[in-house]
From Swiss-Prot, chain A:
The gene is APT1. One of its GO terms (biological process) is cytokinin metabolic process. Pathway: Purine metabolism; AMP biosynthesis via salvage pathway; AMP from adenine: step 1/1. This is Adenine phosphoribosyltransferase 1, chloroplastic. It comes from Arabidopsis thaliana (Mouse-ear cress). GO terms for cellular component: chloroplast.
UniProtKB/Swiss-Prot annotation, chain B:
This is Adenine phosphoribosyltransferase 5. It comes from the Eukaryota. GO terms for molecular function: adenine phosphoribosyltransferase activity. Homodimer.
Length: 243, 191
């Protein structure tokens, strides 16, 4: 067995010892909203980031009028890696959040505070980073954890849901019998971008009669308008970031 | 070593954990009795027992890092890390981690695979436990150990929910202790 060191294609901000704050927090109604020209990773059109007030209406953040002091620490613990997995994408790396014991604890606590005592019996988490946040939340609120996986990973009988990618389609699966009709669920993932994966997860659970109370993510990329794909289902996020 | 041989003999929690694990025959191929832990995750009490047993064992051992092997190690590792105040480090398949990585290859039945970890995630002399759902040959865990030791970390123990018969009687994996909660269910007719 050999130990090999591999460098990424591009990586400007590799501070693991100290988290680099790269996320913009859109949560203060009283500050003048920032107008920022950003490049969308899908096209060369520059988008104007919408105002913080509008952002708050579109999807709820953990900060209503006053920012929860835990949010800033969580946001600053997330590392941004430019041009991963391909040029133009600013990848939101939550592995650095997991190295910050206070930030990780606070992340879970914020979700648990929101969802405990709401009659939620199912926490569904999307492979693989949803597996990191989902189970601690499920354990704390007394719910089951249901993994939603890529094809052929789950060993038992499954139901599948296909969804669109930029090029082609992908599929997520869930075990038959994992959930029962009438159960109340939340769906967890680390990040919502276009919303395709979460929308597929919603469809999968609704097909078996589950009520999705909310989708919850650590990070949202609002310019990608993922929330629109979720239909009637509300979205709760801790941090919003530029795509 | 199995938990029952190490202070937890007769602990009813181990029986509940074992009973909650579903066996799926002939997955991913004929002859394999797959140990499906997704049913353990559906049983809140049994899942909590699983985490509690690991937490009780490691909370006073000055462990600062829990490393979990993708993807089923992710289901157990973070909860343990949170409870003992340790960092969680995901060990992933190639190409998934976005930053600078180190990589270790390991043998499969046919061919080989690779495991990666972010450079800088662990610091020299940190005390680490490695978590996975199941240990069979120990190949994946050995690769995980190599990654962590190459960065100067001390692997204190490897811990798994299920241990296949190959590891029974072996208290160590590559010289490091191995701690396992239960044996596989449904193997009687094969032994």
């Amino acid at each position: 067995m050999q130990t090999i060191i591999i460098s990424p294609l591009v990586s400007h901000r590799l501070c693991l010892a100290r988290a680099v704050p790269c996320n913009r927090l859109l949560n203060n109604h009283h500050r003048a909203p920032p107008s920022i020209r950003l490049s969308n990773h899908r096209s060369t059109t520059s988008l104007r980031l919408f105002s913080s007030a509008a952002a708050s209406r579109d999807s709820e953040m953990a900060t209503e009028d006053v920012q929860d002091p835990r949010i800033a620490k969580i946001a600053s613990s997330i590392r941004v890696i430019p041009d991963f997995p391909k040029p133009g994408i600013m990848f939101q790396d939550i592995t650095t959040l997991l190295l910050d014991t206070e930030a990780f604890k606070d992340t879970i606590a914020l979700f648990v505070d929101r969802y405990k005592d709401k009659g939620i019996s199912v926490v569904a988490g999307v492979e693989a980073r949803g597996f990191i946040f989902g189970p601690p939340i499920a354990l704390a609120i007394g719910a089951k954890f249901v993994p939603m996986r890529k094809p052929k990973k789950l060993p038992g009988k499954v139901i599948s849901e296909e969804y669109s990618l930029e090029y082609g389609t992908d599929t997520i699966e869930m075990h038959v019998g994992a959930v029962e009709p009438g159960e109340r669920a939340i769906i967890i993932d680390d990040l919502i971008a276009t919303g395709g994966t979460l929308a597929a997860a919603i469809r999968l659970l609704e097909r078996v009669g589950v009520k999705i109370v909310e989708c919850a993510c650590v990070i949202e990329l609002p310019e990608l308008k993922g929330k629109e794909k979720l239909g009637e289902t509300s979205l709760f996020v801790l941090v919003k970031s530029a795509a | 070593m199995f938990a029952a041989e190490n202070g937890l003999k007769g602990d009813p929690r181990l029986e509940a954990i074992s009973a909650a694990i579903r066996v799926v025959p002939n997955f991913p191929k004929k002859g394999i009795m797959f140990q499906d832990i997704t049913t353990l995750l559906l049983d809140h009490k049994a899942f909590k027992h699983t985490i509690d047993i690991f937490v009780d064992r490691y909370k006073d051992m000055q462990i600062s890092v829990v490393a979990g092997v993708e993807a089923r190690g992710f289901l157990f590792g973070p909860s343990i890390a949170l409870a003992i105040g340790a960092k969680f480090i995901p060990l992933r398949k190639p190409g998934k981690l976005p930053g600078k990585v180190i990589s270790e290859s390991y043998e499969l039945e046919y061919g080989h695979d690779r495991l990666e970890m972010h450079v800088g995630a662990v610091e020299p002399r940190e005390r680490v436990i490695i978590i996975d759902d199941l240990v069979a040959t120990g190949g994946t865990l050995s690769a995980a150990m190599s990654l962590l030791e190459s960065q100067g970390a001390e692997v204190v123990e490897c811990a798994c929910v299920i241990g296949l018969p190959e590891v029974k009687g072996q208290h160590k994996l590559k010289g490091k202790p191995l701690y396992v909660l239960v044996e596989p269910s449904g193997l009687d007719e094969f032994c």
